[in-house]
Swiss-Prot record:
The keyword Repeat applies. It is found in: Cytoplasm, Cytoskeleton, Cilium axoneme; Cell projection, Cilium; Cell projection, Cilium, Flagellum. It comes from Mus musculus (Mouse). This is Radial spoke head 10 homolog B. Residues 790-832 form a coiled coil.
Amino acid sequence: MVKEKKKADKKGDKSARSPSSISDNPEASKQDSNASKQEVAPSAVVPVVETPLKQAPKRDSVQMEQSEEETQYEEPILTKLIVESYEGEKVRGLYEGEGFAVFQGGNTYHGMFSEGLMHGQGTYIWADGLKYEGDFVKNIPMNHGVYTWPDGSTYEGEVTNGMRNGFGMFKCGTQPVSYIGHWCHGKRHGKGSIYYNQEGTSWYEGDWVYNIKKGWGIRCYKSGNIYEGQWENNMRHGEGRMRWLTTNEEYTGHWEKGIQNGFGTHTWFLKRIPNSQYPLRNEYIGEFVNGFRHGQGKFYYASGAMYEGEWASNKKQGRGRMTFKNGHVYEGLFSNDHIAQFFETEMDYSQSLDRWSDASQRSRQPRGSSVSAVREPETLRKLDGSESRSVLGTSIELDLTLLLDMYPEESQEEEKKQVEYAVLRNITELRRIYCFYSGLGCDHSLDNTFLMTKLHFWRFLKDCRFHHHNITLADMDRVLSVYNGIPIEEIHSPFRTILLRTFLNYLLQLAYYIHHKEFQNRSPSLFLCFTKLMSENIHPHACQVKGHLFSEQQRTLYSMNYIDKCWEIYTAYCRPNEAPPYELTMKMRYFLWMLKDFRMINKDLTATKFMTVIAEDNPFVYDGTDSNFELELVFLEFFEALLCFSLCCMFDQMTRSYLKVPYDDITTNRYGSTQTILNQSIHRSPSAITSHDSEVHFSSTKSSLDKIGALPDGKIRQSEPKLKKSLSEDKVSKMNFKTQGRGLVFMSPQGEKYEKPKDEQKEKLNIWVNNLYVFFVSVLFSAYKREEMLKEKVKENQLQEAELAQQRQIENEELEARLNILREEEARKQDFELDITVLKEPSEIPASQPLTPSPPKEDLASIQTSKASPGKKKKK
């Protein structure tokens, strides 16, 4: 019987592959770290589970392999099953039903038998600990099952002939690696996803061909970099896109063996600097060889410059065409990333090159690359847009349609030509002015190109005294909105950006509005208006910055920290204009009322001082006797007035404000907030050394101010000289330093006399920063917050009163309705009672008495006397 069982088992033997160790092969890194970055895939082990019955599969140790070839295991031939013991049912001498068998060698099986074979649900355990739980079909694992290895690795899914086949999930026990997808003959085959870490940040999802990535797939690396495209032999091969999120780069194109090869596009996304005019994106479109820019290609620089020509190993080599950002073009030979011919030139084209972009590229490339600043006279020319009718070319287009409509049709062409000539003659000066004002209040930019905002434009108009022509800045905004179709909500917005061509259009429109009456009978009128504006306003006064906001770079950076909140306050207290387009505006009267509501008008900041501050930059506000409170203020005038107010009441009011705050708040919250502002401005300042000095000496200022905050009110005045003295003493006791080259040289206290003027300047700046913070945060913003809370409280009270009034009205209506119902019920009740009374009157006659006529009264009297007489007789 045992021999027959052996034969049956031998017939049912099937071969199976033992589990093999599979690693995610690392891919070769590219040679060029700039244009051809290669993400190295983390290697991991994914054992392939195989299920022999007669012999325990050899489970290879899980290890990180660096080779691309996987260790392959031959399918072992099943040995004979020799049953040493059996516990269970038998039918006609064959195992049947549930039973437990122990085989020779230590393997065991517990489960269902049929006709002497393992058939149905069961658990087979090899002597080395490998276990299979699932379905058996005639001694063969089939359909669905779970494999568990001694190290904890598991596979659960479909099984065919003892091998993983179909859909299943594998989890490695020694490493956080898992695979879920399709299998074929024990190997990953078809669609599947593999995860290389427990967090799920490193994974591959796509096509597999017998444990090899082949076809289309997405690979996400632990660093966050992502590749999406075609694969071949576990490497990027074919068309695909790689995104390096860590360096903000992207390549889309052809790959060969994990490296860029063929035609593609590589883009460098760079962080945009605030107020920068360009999107700051460098892009190369062309041919690659082994990860290098090699062959024909175009390189677009972030500033607008562009190179088109031949490349060799990431360098411009051979014939090419370089278009600089100022519009000039060099076309000729390049050698080793430089223009081939060198000579002297009057124009300094080093400013024209996008040095920032080249520096960015040099930092990323294995070998340096730069573009020379020289040119060849025969091949350098200006892009003047010969196909354009404008003398300014295609780079600058003036929108003169509405202005020319003011002139007769026959003279419009001449007016346009003459004014374009006038702009062309002054274009260099106007570009310089635009660049100067657009950079006010901005940090140093790598490409030195900024966008002008309305705030800069207002400062330009006031510096050039446009408002001296009996027109306010608010009026100018409305004029420009008519010509340019600006939305109502953005007419007076300080953050609206202005391009160079828009800046030129604004100047022409304002020139016409200011001087058109003077030259209306002369031709060319628009030319004369613009020329007079240039000669009387722009040339003499441009770039001579006045006011309190942009006068000093360091203070401007500090002041910009409060501009957003001040804009919120400004818009909150604006009122609709009485004339079209009915936009929100701020009049001087509203401004003064706002300060009064904030309780800031006192002996330090009087109404007279308020008027004097506003009139500093506007002669039409106050002439010493009469004041005009109806003048409108744009946000620049509003904000600069606040800055001036912070200087007017700089010490007395600030000290009192400090005394109103608990000492703990002074030493913690206020200092922390001020320090934050200092640190923010330090990062934005062009000189890190200067900012660092300010940060160091600010601590001494804080300690002195804290001492003031702890003093009683009566000792404040006496402590003011001590404050200044203590500040100086702190600086003597503290470590002094000065800049030498790029480093810091620490000095002894004896060197103070050499640094005294510099320290005094820093001390003034630090005190100004503290006072500025206290004025805006502790005084202005706190008062605004209090007013807003009061307004909200008033609104809440009004809503509550309205709700109560409505509720009372509803209650009164309900009460009135109830009274009406009661009245109606009472009336119905009375009517009902009346009806009952009427009905009761005829029904009072007894129904039992016969309806006979009553005897007359005389008869009744005789009857009574007759009844009484016998009694009398009896008594007698």
